[in-house]
A protein has these predicted regions:
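RNA pseudouridine synthases
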Residues: 1-239
Length: 239
């Protein structure tokens, strides 16, 4: 187990979309690990946050200061960070009861039969590979709502989806889409060994985040434009 508490690292780059005394909303670049873990002890978002916002050091888990939900290192987009213990508890409960909303921009292989669908399939650790998640009978309940928002014929038959997380399991969108045979483009783990089409990472971006502010209880919404690497790739795709 990892026991070393993360230290501040001002060299970690990320954009702050919004900040006040209770919450910070960041736009995470692709390739940035959210918090320290085996193999990634330094240079994580948590280290960068501690350099910019030292007050989060004692919020929540010392290994994951202020962090109340996660994004895979290969994904980009919005993440909310708590600055106080009260804010952390308030936000954690919203992710637990699904009142916080997360919308992702995704590109998948093929065209789903139904333009709108809900993937309701329990997820757990893969029996063959503990680093992978899989649809398993006794897994945790998991639901992903998807809507097809565009289809393309080049560089392959692919579809752009808007995915809403009704639960937030590890790798949920990636595993769910792969389970209906429409894996994410560029996904090295769940991509069913399809070609990368020039993508260096999974085409998955956390585009919208909505929650009730811990103090005012007002509903707040944040948007993030598609990450520049994905946008550059998309500019070359053809309908």
């Amino acid at each position: 187990p990892v026991t070393e508490v993360p230290g501040p690292d001002p060299s970690v780059e990320f954009d702050v979309v919004y900040e006040d005394d209770l919450v910070i909303v960041v736009d995470k670049p692709p390739g940035l690990v959210v918090h320290p873990g085996a193999g990634n002890m330094t240079g994580t978002l948590a280290n960068g946050l501690l350099a910019r916002f030292p007050d989060i050091e004692d919020v929540g888990d010392r290994m994951r200061p202020g962090i109340v939900h996660r994004l895979d290192s290969g994904s980009s987009g919005l993440l909310v960070i708590a600055r106080t213990q009260d804010a952390a508890e308030h936000l954690v409960s919203q992710f637990a009861d699904h009142s916080a909303t997360r919308v992702y921009d995704a590109m998948v292989w093929g065209v789903p039969e139904a333009p709108h669908g809900i993937i309701d399939a329990p997820l757990g650790r893969s029996r063959s590979d503990p680093l992978r998640m899989a649809v398993v009978a006794n897994g945790r309940p998991s639901r992903t709502d998807y809507q097809v928002i565009g289809t393309f014929s080049s560089p392959a038959t692919i579809s752009r989806l808007e995915c809403r997380l009704e639960t937030g399991r590890t790798h949920q969108i990636r595993v769910h889409l792969s389970s209906i045979n429409h894996p994410l483009l560029g996904d090295p783990t769940y991509g069913q060994r399809k070609p990368t089409l020039g993508l260096a990472r999974p085409f998955l971006h956390a585009a919208q985040l909505q929650f009730n502010h811990p103090e005012t209880r007002e509903r707040v919404t944040f948007h993030s434009p598609l990450a520049s690497d994905l946008q550059a790739w998309l500019d070359n795709a053809e309908v």
